[in-house]
């Protein structure tokens, strides 16, 4: 039996109840897999079966995009113009193409207007049969349309041969040279931004896949928070480093409330914590020991906590040597206690390693269930003591604030 958690239809704990009870012991435990539905919508949960309780908004989406809005910054447009290169590169393609097309058309038109003004001042627009000996500044430019076409042909180096500049007007020659220099610089800038945007390692980072959920299980006798990461391309990533930041509200001893307090969460692979070889989908572990910022998690309070775990993978692209970063985040509703990931890597009949990504998002109950189903009274007592200690700290902070006033 496979239970699928569909966003908005039922809560995750209800879906997990479809798995057989663990009280029968590890020997009779049936290894059932759960497929985690992908969704970027804010998660909600039932509060004592009455209504829905919304959780704190994400700082970072599952795809790694920041949800923080920058507002009320003095001179923000000037700051963007001062860093024009980054501003143009960060533009979306539709805005970039529109801006560059408008830039070319405007330069053609503006220089065409100046050419038309030169021809008007020189009297080239009033030529007739009686003025056949008059030499114009620009041949065949007797209207604004002709001036625009001359500007376009000169800037794009088309050179049809009908319209050409003469030696009669030195200022027209100077304007032609200025146009070619200015537009060449514009073309260099445009070409550079296009190449820089295409070659950005951002697209390479999108081929790094994180598991949609995280699990808490025992690894080598230690309680660990586990996530999966996979490289979707054959080209390798070198010098990989995975780290995490725990974001949660924190109240200092002075009573100051920090909305997004950051705590470092260290991950490791097997016995190594630096530069894992990410050639196959790998499992990263964070040990929930006394030094862990997640040490207070229990099966009872996991879904009641309000925090966000941001995971960052920094790596160097083998083919371009560019540094890329892939990000994701996990909230309590996406962390499952007492589960483990279904193995993804297997050995084929031909002796080759095969990564089956249809199993990448699936989890199953851990066979070692003693760490979360035994001694529940002790866990409840520890949780009660922890809540009393938290209330005592909040009371001391409140008294300290009143004394300062």
UniProtKB/Swiss-Prot annotation:
Residues 118-143, 161-169 are extracellular. The chain crosses the membrane at residues 91-117, 170-195. One of its GO terms (biological process) is potassium ion transport. The keyword Transit peptide does not apply. It holds the Pfam family IRK. It is found in: Membrane; Cell membrane. The record marks 187 as: Role in the control of polyamine-mediated channel gating and in the blocking by intracellular magnesium. Residues 1-90, 196-405 are cytoplasmic. This is ATP-sensitive inward rectifier potassium channel 15. It comes from Rattus norvegicus. Inward rectifier potassium channels are characterized by a greater tendency to allow potassium to flow into the cell rather than out of it. Their voltage dependence is regulated by the concentration of extracellular potassium; as external potassium is raised, the voltage range of the channel opening shifts to more positive voltages. The inward rectification is mainly due to the blockage of outward current by internal magnesium. A motif (Selectivity filter) lies at residues 157-162. It is a multi-pass membrane protein. Can form heteromultimeric channels with Kir5.1/KCNJ16. Interacts with PATJ. Signal peptide: none annotated. Residues 144-160 dip into the membrane without crossing it. The lineage of its organism: Eukaryota, Metazoa, Chordata, Craniata, Vertebrata.
């Amino acid at each position: 039996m496979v239970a699928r958690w569909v966003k908005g239809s039922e809560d995750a704990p209800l879906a997990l109840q479809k798995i057989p009870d663990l009280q029968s012991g590890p020997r009779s435990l049936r290894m059932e897999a759960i497929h985690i539905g992908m969704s970027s919508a804010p998660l909600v949960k039932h509060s004592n079966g009455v209504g829905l309780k919304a959780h704190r908004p994400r700082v970072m989406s599952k795809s790694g995009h920041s949800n923080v809005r920058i507002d009320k910054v003095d001179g923000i447009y000037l700051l963007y113009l001062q860093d024009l290169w980054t501003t143009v590169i960060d533009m979306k393609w539709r805005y970039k193409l529109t801006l560059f097309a408008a830039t070319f058309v405007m330069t053609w038109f503006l220089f065409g207007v100046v050419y038309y003004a030169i021809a008007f001042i020189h009297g080239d627009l009033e030529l007739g049969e009686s003025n056949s000996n008059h030499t114009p500044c620009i041949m065949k430019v007797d209207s604004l349309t002709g001036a625009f076409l001359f500007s376009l042909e000169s800037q794009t180096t088309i050179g049809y041969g009908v319209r050409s500049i003469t030696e009669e007007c030195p200022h027209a020659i100077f304007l032609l040279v200025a146009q070619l220099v200015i537009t060449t610089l514009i073309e260099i800038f445009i070409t550079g931004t296009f190449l820089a945007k295409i070659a950005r390692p951002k697209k390479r980072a999108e081929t790094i896949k994180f598991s949609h959920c995280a699990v808490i299980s025992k690894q080598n006798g230690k309680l660990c928070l586990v996530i999966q990461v996979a490289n979707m391309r054959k080209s390798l990533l070198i010098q990989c480093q995975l780290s995490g930041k725990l974001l949660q509200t924190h109240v200092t001893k002075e009573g100051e409330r920090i909305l997004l307090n950051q705590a470092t969460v260290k991950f490791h692979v097997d016995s190594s914590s630096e530069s894992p070889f990410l050639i196959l989908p790998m499992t990263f572990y964070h040990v929930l020991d006394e030094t862990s910022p997640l040490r207070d998690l229990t099966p009872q309070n996991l879904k009641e906590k309000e925090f966000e775990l941001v995971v960052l993978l920094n790596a160097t692209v083998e083919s371009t040597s560019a540094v890329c970063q892939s990000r994701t985040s996990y909230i309590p509703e996406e962390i499952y206690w007492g589960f483990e990931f279904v193995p993804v890597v297997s050995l084929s009949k031909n002796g080759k390693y095969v990564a089956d990504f249809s199993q990448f998002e699936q989890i199953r109950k851990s066979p070692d269930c003693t760490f979360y189903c035994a001694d529940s009274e002790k866990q409840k007592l520890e949780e009660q003591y922890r809540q009393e200690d938290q209330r005592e700290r909040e009371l001391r902070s409140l008294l300290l604030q009143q004394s300062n006033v």
